[in-house]
Amino acid sequence: MGQQISDQTQLVINKLPEKVAKHVTLVRESGSLTYEEFLGRVAELNDVTAKVASGQEKHLLFEVQPGSDSSAFWKVVVRVVCTKINKSSGIVEASRIMNLYQFIQLYKDITSQAAGVLAQSSTSEEPDENSSSVTSCQASLWMGRVKQLTDEEECCICMDGRADLILPCAHSFCQKCIDKWSDRHRNCPICRLQMTGANESWVVSDAPTEDDMANYILNMADEAGQPHRP
């Protein structure tokens, strides 16, 4: 029975426009993700980015922000910190903080693209020259994707208007949609998280920055999530 329901749901998703289907898939994935699987993905990103950037002077470090995963509602409040570190000096050059939804998007992008980069590098007869060229090209594509995810964040309701507001649960909406919803409801339209007060119900989201963008794979995460100071 459960498999039948799952198959029917997937059939419906397959008929949706690509943009909406991807959003639905990410929401479903974050909803079914266990805490152990989440930690496994954080560790996997550290491993994958270390392999891809093994010949570069900088590397990424993904960590769960201390205390953000201690609540029973960890999926709502958990934050993942991504730090770019210079290997030789140990200096932190950039740091970003992401919610669970943003982290899952970044995870899927990095792992899918890195698989191709690593496979091509392993079959190359001249890794020194070809590997460098492939990584540089791939990095540009990844950074473009991250910029798109952050600069053009869309409303979770209409999937059309640009997101103007973000709730404490990290779901974002355009002003038009959330105005209609908030006239009758005091909770999030997506996860139903209850808003406790008018002053903290709708929070204006900060525009993402483009600090320290470079031309290689390590900068893919610089624009994911929001700026973070350790």
Curated annotation (Swiss-Prot):
InterPro entries referenced in this protein's UniProt entry, alphabetically: RING-HC_RNF141 (IPR043400), RNF141-like (IPR047126), Znf_RING (IPR001841), Znf_RING/FYVE/PHD (IPR013083), Znf_RING_CS (IPR017907)
Covalent lipid sites (N-myristoyl glycine): 2
Predominant location category: membrane
Annotated coiled-coil segments of the chain: none
Localization (cell): Membrane
Presence of the UniProt keyword Thylakoid in the record: no
SMART domains: RING (SM00184)
Superkingdom to which the source organism belongs: Eukaryota
Name of the protein described by the UniProt record: RING finger protein 141
The species this protein was found in: Homo sapiens
